[in-house]
Amino acid sequence: PLDFQPGQFIQVHFSYADGTETKRSYSLATIHDHALGPGEAVDIAVSFVPGGAATALFEALDIGGQVSASGPYGRFCLNPGDHNGRYLLIATGTGVTPYRSMLPLLATAMAERGVQVVLLQGARSPGELLYSEDFYSFAEKHPNFRYVPCLSRELPAEPHPDVHHGYVQQALAAFTPDPATDIAYLCGNPDMVDACAEALKAAGLGNPQIRREKYVSSK
């Protein structure tokens, strides 16, 4: 069985063309409420890297094909001992993957503690907003959850009122990070993670309030 905490990742093991062994890490996007048994599917998101070895691996994989993986690993998870008033979830690209798996836990936190949640998701265009339908649907059902797509290039023809034109690090300031209430999660592009971490520190948040995971695309 694969029993994981939302926010954790697995590692896929494979070899380069010359036989050298390597691995890639992928956060689990699966929404689950039990340990996953044989035959049950898990969801991961794989970035397309032109010429990338992992990209070639998955492109050549047939339905029903097998890969070798290990895990789960990682501590980029919601802490049951948190007593904050608001979560700031910030992501670019496939960095939004762990937040999808966290949705049931966030729903519980909102119901039990009245916590507020803001999700800032960065992408270049609407078509690159991974899992956006899930987040919009969740926002409609949970008034304490605000979903803010941040699009750096192309805007939709009829943008939702919460759509921001620009980068997530630019949109962050509008939500006035508050060290008295906030815990922030940063996941995705390393430059974004660093920029947002510095902005949060400048706002007064301490290191324990800033939880981060950087995604680096490799060939």
Which ranges hold each PLM region?
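Conserved beta-strand elements of the Class I
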Residues: 86-90, 185
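Short, conserved phosphate/pyrophosphate- and ester-handling motifs at nucleotide-, phospho-/glycolipid
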Residues: 7, 95, 189
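Reductase modules of NAD(P)H-dependent flavoproteins
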Residues: 117-219
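Histidine-anchored nucleotide/phosphate-binding helix
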Residues: 98-110
